[in-house]
A protein has these predicted regions:
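Flexible, acidic glycine-rich loops studded with aromatic residues
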Residues: 383-398, 404-556
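Bacterial N-terminal signal peptides
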Residues: 9-21
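Short, compositionally stereotyped local motifs that mark structural "simplifiers"
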Residues: 60, 510, 516-646, 684-692, ...
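Contiguous, structured surface segment used for ligand recognition
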Residues: 30-169, 487, 503-525, 529
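Active-site neighborhood of glycoside hydrolase catalytic domains
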Residues: 278, 283, 294-296, 300-397, ...
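Feature activates predominantly on carbohydrate-active enzymes
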Residues: 108-312, 316, 321-330, 371, ...
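Extracytoplasmic
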Residues: 612-777
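Sec/Tat signal peptide C-region and signal peptidase I cleavage site
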Residues: 25-28
Length: 777
């Protein structure tokens, strides 16, 4: 009797599957919990019976295609490295206890990336009509064989999988311009993309902060344009210069490595904006003729390409070498955030506009993009660009990547253009995954795992015909705040697991609870392969009414996690919690002082996140991290940043609002409070805000370097203290400020506001503590 599980249904649990008792050394790949697959297949049927994969199992290549041999070897190597099973690969007919791989023009799934996977008591068979489908079938089998972190044999239930992707474009963009990654690091990322069935690697290779691709006709692009001098260079761990580039041999290696995993590499050469590194190398291709340094400022810099014929020859020369290296049909030309000030100020550019009969600078950008698009068309390629390319008119066959929300995708699809959904902040991996104090550097607001999983690539505003233009969705790893690959991996995983299901699986099969129950197996795979994934979704949040605890000496403590999944266990004595610790069911009454530690465990007792801790004492409750303080009302551009932008370490991070250096200390009983102590930090102000610079609030200051001003309740409330900031040239980066506060009664919030000049360093709060009378600062 067959139990059928169509993954077009909302619930895809292998409930009720009956497996024979197994020896202790053999793991179950599917139990009554969930099938350990991400992304979820389009259709899965489970039957009675099982097949045991062990050291006696062989992988059989049943056709004569070299590509099938490569997939078989890939599967064998993956199983060996993650499961410890060394399965021989041979060519020929299937035998008992074998895994058969076969390219078959009559395979049941027609889609070129689709496959059929059948597990029977006699063996396993993967068939597909194309190499890509066979590869993805092998990836699915590998996931079935790695349901946990154990080594050795695995027993699979008999099953039939018929699978194919929902979308053709399943992408990840990596920014190698702001921070540089080695070829080996990129190869590790490509490995993970393949295991998540992602098939487009969008490689951001040029920007204001660095040119990363060798162009032999223009050697200054990498001799000068690939390197920048960081703020505070040579001090406090900041390098004297930062940069790097990929030789053409490096590029070929990455492209070949990706192709072997059925990933297309789409290069991005940004134009006409984000061009400061180009102009630093070849100022004649800029507008002003002046040579700027390669930028150290994150954001929107003013440098644009010129629009004369010499500059266009430079662009086409570069594209010729790019096309020779990248076989991708698509070439990404950027087109975003091109601030037109230099064009507006240039007499030559304005004369060019008049000669072309163009009404404005947006139309001039449209003219440039159209000219580049026609050049790419003539060479058998297709232009793709960010959604700003719509503003000045766009080539008829151009593809639009929508990043300013989904409006660009809607507009483009309604005009008949193919689109890729890549909206900020929804699919921007530099957005923080939680607002916990210990989260790494990145941008606010939070975009957690659940928000990525809930993203729908087809906007509801499109009709059925227009929806056919949606190629898929892509996540973007912008690396301003990711100086190391560890930062990138923390930002990308497991959010890419969520995206893979958005891009691959049928929309109707999406089920958050089911997805979270499949994540423990994926986390085990990450750990086995050394991936520094984020555990933010399962990290325990320890919450309480702070003021009630301060007043009564007893706290009502609530535990939760983002995922709403797993089992929470806790201790109250500071010891490490585990499955033998009390299980959380309802708020806890905890007498101060105490140390609450909590952890989320999976159904099998595995730890889904590292334990989190909160010390409950009067002193700790009166001490608040700057990362936990909200911004003051008004203009808001909130980041968490490291003190040094290019330091290659997981340094502490600090919350800043680029528009207004002001934060709110929460309302607190102020009776008996005598002193405020602030641990402060001085940061680099390396941000290019372009026209948004007018939003930066400048506060009057009474001393040369500004003050930290403490207001009662609101930022226009009574001044309780004003503490001068030290001379940045003669003080440490981290320093402490303190002041006596006037006597107050009742509960009050505090506004903590820096008045430092906006042309100098940026300041942040590490921690602010209130000290009662009689407590030494």
């Amino acid at each position: 009797m067959t139990r059928r599980f169509l993954l077009l249904c909302r619930h895809c649990l292998l409930a009720g599957v009956i497996l024979a008792a197994l020896p202790a050394r053999v793991a179950h790949a599917a139990t009554a919990a969930t099938v350990p697959l991400i992304p979820l297949p389009a259709q899965l049927d489970v039957e009675r019976g099982s097949f045991n994969v062990d050291a006696h199992t062989s992988i059989v290549v049943a056709d004569h295609a070299a590509s099938t041999q490569r997939t078989a070897r890939y599967l064998a190597e993956l199983i060996a490295s993650t499961r410890g099973l060394h399965l021989p690969v041979r060519q020929g007919a299937a035998t008992a206890s074998s895994i058969v791989l076969l390219r078959d023009p009559h395979a049941p799934v027609v889609n070129r990336e689709g496959y059929a996977l059948d597990v029977a008591p006699q063996g396993i068979r993967i068939t597909a009509r194309d190499d890509a489908g066979l590869f993805y079938g092998a990836v699915t089998l590998w996931q079935l064989l790695t349901p946990d972190a154990q080594r050795g044999a695995v027993q699979l239930p008999a099953m039939h999988i018929r699978d194919q992707p929902r979308f053709a474009w399943r992408g990840l963009m990596l920014d190698s311009a702001r921070h540089f990654q080695s070829v080996a690091e990129i190869e590790q990322l490509l490995n993970q993309m393949a295991q998540h069935k992602l098939n487009v690697f969008h490689w951001h290779l040029t920007d204001d902060q660095g040119w990363r691709i060798q162009i032999k006709r223009y050697p200054e692009l990498t001799r000068l344009g690939a390197w920048r001098r960081p703020p505070n260079a040579g001090h406090d761990g900041e390098p004297q210069r930062y940069g790097g580039f990929y030789t053409q041999d490096d590029i070929r290696r990455v492209v070949a490595y990706a192709a072997a995993r059925h990933i297309t590499v789409v290069p991005e050469i940004d134009m006409p904006g984000h061009a400061q590194a180009v102009v630093a190398a070849y100022p004649q291709f800029g507008v002003t003729g002046r040579r700027p340094p390669v930028s150290v400022d994150w954001g929107v810099n003013p440098y644009l390409y010129n629009v004369d014929d010499a500059t266009f020859r430079f662009i086409t020369d570069v594209l010729d070498e790019v096309m020779a290296l990248f076989p991708s049909k698509y070439i990404h030309v950027g087109g975003d955030e091109a601030v037109k000030d230099q064009w507006q100020a240039s007499l030559a550019v304005q004369a060019k506009m008049r000669a072309l009969g163009l009404k404005d600078e947006d139309a001039l950008q449209g003219w440039l993009i159209d000219r580049v698009g026609r050049y790419l068309d003539a060479h058998g390629r297709r232009l793709i660009g960010w959604d700003e390319i719509l503003d000045g008119g766009v080539p008829a066959d151009a593809t639009v990547m929508s990043w300013r929300g989904t409006k660009g995708a809607i507009r483009a699809a309604q005009q008949g253009h193919d689109v890729v959904l890549s909206p900020a902040p929804d699919l921007y991996l530099d957005q923080l995954q939680s607002d916990r104090a210990g989260e790494t550097a990145g941008r606010m607001p939070v975009r957690d795992l659940a928000s990525v999983y809930s993203f729908e690539p087809v906007p509801k505003e499109l009709d059925a015909a227009q929806a056919q233009h949606v190629l898929g969705a892509q996540a973007n790893a912008w690396t301003e705040h990711m100086p190391t690959m560890q930062h990138v991996e923390h930002a990308a995983f497991p959010r890419l697991a969520a995206l893979s299901e958005v891009d691959w699986s049928p929309a109707a099969s999406r089920d958050w609870g089911n997805f979270t129950r499949r994540l423990p197996a994926q986390f085990a795979r990450y750990r086995t392969q050394g991936i520094a994934y984020a555990d933010s979704a399962f990290a325990a949040d320890i919450a309480l009414d702070r003021n009630a605890a301060l007043a009564s000496g007893t706290a009502q403590v609530s535990l939760s996690n983002q995922a709403g999944s797993g089992v929470l266990h806790y201790t109250l004595d500071g010891s490490v919690p585990g499955r033998d610790s009390p299980e959380y069911h309802a708020p806890l009454t905890v007498k101060l002082p105490a140390t609450v530690r909590a952890v989320t465990l999976g159904a099998d007792g595995s730890m889904l996140a590292a334990p989190r801790q909160r010390v409950l004492s009067r002193a700790e409750l009166l001490s608040v991290s700057g990362n936990e303080m909200p911004n003051c009302p008004g203009s808001d551009f909130r980041l968490r940043v490291q003190p040094l932008p290019d330091a290659a370490s997981l340094a502490p991070v600090y919350s800043v609002n680029l528009f207004n250096t002001c934060q709110s200390y929460p309302s607190t009983p102020m009776d008996g409070i005598a002193t405020i102590r602030v641990d402060a930090v001085r940061l680099e102000r390396n941000y290019a805000l372009a026209h948004e610079a007018k939003l930066v609030v400048s506060h009057p200051h009474a001393t040369p370097f500004g003050e930290l001003v403490v207001h009662q309740d609101r930022c226009d409330g009574p001044v309780l203290a004003s503490i001068p900031l030290p001379d940045p040239a003669r003080s440490a980066r981290n320093f402490t400020l303190q002041a006596t506060l006037p006597a107050q009664r009742g509960e009050h919030a505090l506004c903590l506001l820096y008045t430092a000049p906006t042309d100098g360093p940026l300041y942040a709060l590490d921690r602010a503590a209130l000290l009662p009378e009689g407590v030494a600062p």
